[in-house]
Amino acid sequence: MTSVAEGLFKSLPKPKYTGEDEEVPQHAQPRGPRIVGADQIDQSQIVLRRTGPPPYGNRAGWRPRAAEDFGDGGAFPEILVAQYPLDMGRKGTATTSNALAVQVDAEGKVKYDAIARRGHSENRIVHASFKDLIPLRQRVDMGEISLDRPSEEEVQAQMEKTKNALASLVEGAVAAQKPKNVKGGRRAEPTFVRYTPANQMGDTTRKNDRIMKIVERQQDPMEPPKFKHKKIPRGPPSPPPPIMHSPPRKLTAEDQEAWRIPPPVSNWKNPKGYTVPLDKRLAADGRGLQDVTINDKFAQFAEALFTADRHAREEVRLRAQMQQKLAEKEKAQKEEHLRALAQKAREERAASNRRDSRARSHTRSASRSPSAYSRSATPSDDEEAARERERIRRERRQDAERQLRQSRMGTERRIQMMAREQNRDISEKVALGLAKPTQTSESMWDSRLFNQTSGLQSGFNEDNPYDKPLFAAQDAINSIYRPRAQLDVDDEEGAEGEMSKIQKTNRFEVLGKAKEGFRGAAEAEARDGPVQFEKDTTDPFGIDSMIADVTGGAGQKRYGIQEVEREDRGSKRARVDDD
C-alpha cells in the first residue's frame, strides 16, 4: 500500500507554486516580536545591532559620528575630536532644536546669559548679571572702563549711523502715509535695446541694427486692483529679554486689598439691566480710594457748643434758685406784713368798739334830757355813691347784652355789619357763601367784546369799565334784621322779646345745615349762653382781697358788690328816736 502511494506521488509533476515565496495576507501576518530558537539563529543569520557608545575599555579607535553614538548624553571629553551631539554647533546644517550648547567663561563658570542672548544680535546689550545693576561709579572694575574722549572717526561713524537710522524711520513714516493701491505713481526709466533682425524667407541681405526704446505702459491710477493679495500673518517675534526682579515676597492681606481693582460700574448706563448691589456701586465709584480729611474745627465747634450749653444750663439753674429764694423771701415779708396789718386791724376794731360803746351811752343820756333834738336833713354822700353804682351796673349790663348779641349773631347780621363798612374785602363774603353771582345771561360776558355802543368807545362811564355789578347781594342785604328806632335801649322787656324772637328763627337754614354733627354732641347739655372761660387772675391766692377786707372793712363780710338799702342803713340815733 505504501509503495503504491509513493509511486503515485512520483508520477505527479512538480508544483509550480510551493507557497514558500508567496506573500502572506495582511490578516494572516504574525504580529509582535518574532521568537527564534537557539538552533535557528545560525540558519536565519540574524545580526544584533547595538546603539550607543561602547563600554569603557573598548573605545580604542572609536569615533562618535552619528547622533545615536552619543546616546542620551553629550560629548566625550577623553576623545579629542570635534563632536556635535544633537548636531549642535555644526555649521551648514539647519537645526530645528531649541537646545543651547553649554558655554563657560574664562573662569570655567557656566554662562547663563546665553539664554537671554538667544535670538538677538551680538551688538544687543543684555543685562543678565548682578553686576549690571551696580552703578558704574561703584563698580570694582571702574578703572578698567575707558572714559577717554572718542576720536573724530568714531564720532563721524556714530553720527552717520544715527543719521541713517533716523532717515529710515522718517522714510518709513512717510511711506506709511502714502496710498499703496494707486497705480502709475512712479514710472520706470525707459530701456534701450539693440535689435538685429534675422534672415527670414531666404532673404540673405544684410539688415541694419535697430535700437528699440522700451517704455512702461501708462496705467490708469483709478483702475481697481485685478488681484487680491492676502497678507501672510507675521510670525511670533523674538522673546523679550528677561527682567531681573527682586525675590518674590508673600503678599499680605493689606497688599491684596490694595491691589484689588473693583469692576467698573457705570452710574448712567445699564444696557443689560443688571441689579448691582449698592456696595459694589460705591466701590466702583472710587470714593474709598480718597482720604477723607475732617477739619479739626468741627470738633472745636462741637466742644464750644457743649461748653456754652453747659454754661447756659448752669446759669438757668442758678437763676431759678435765686428766683425761688426771692419768692420765698417776698412771701415771708408779705406774711409778716399781713400779720402786722391783722394786728393793727384788731387793735383798731377794739378801739372803735370802745368808742361806740361810749357814744351809745352818751346818746342814751342825751335822749332822756327834756331838750328836743332837731334832726338836720343834711345831703348824704351815700346817695351819690349809690347812683354812681347804679349807673355803672346799667352800663355793664348793656355791655354784657351787646356781647351776647354779637356771640349769637347770625349771617345776616354779619352782612349788615359788612355793608356798613365800606372798605370791607369781598373775600369775606365769598368765604361766608353769601356773595352769589348773578344768574342773568347778560352779566356772563363783557359787552365790549360784541362791539356794542354801550362800551368804552361811546364815552359812557369812563371811570367804571363795567356796565353791570359783579355780585348781586341786595336780596341778602334787604333781608337783614334791623332793630326798631323807637325801641328804648333801657327797655329790658323789649330786648328780651327781640332776643327770644331771634333765637326762635332758624337763621342757619339759609346756608344749609350739616347732616351729621360730632359724635356725642347730641347727648351734650344745651348751652343757654356763650362759651365761658376762666379768666386769668393776677391774684390766684386772694391775698389782695384779703388785704382789702382787712384794711377797708369794719368787721363785716361782703361778697361782691352788695347794695345796701338806705332804710337799712339808718343811724342808730334814728332808731332810738323812733322807739
Curated annotation (Swiss-Prot):
It comes from the Eukaryota. Pfam families: SKIP_SNW. Residues 234-245 have a biased composition (Pro residues). Its main location: nucleus. Residues 343-359, 386-414, 521-538, 563-579 have a biased composition (Basic and acidic residues). It is found in: Nucleus. Belongs to the SNW family. This is Pre-mRNA-processing protein 45. It comes from Aspergillus fumigatus (strain ATCC MYA-4609 / CBS 101355 / FGSC A1100 / Af293) (Neosartorya fumigata).
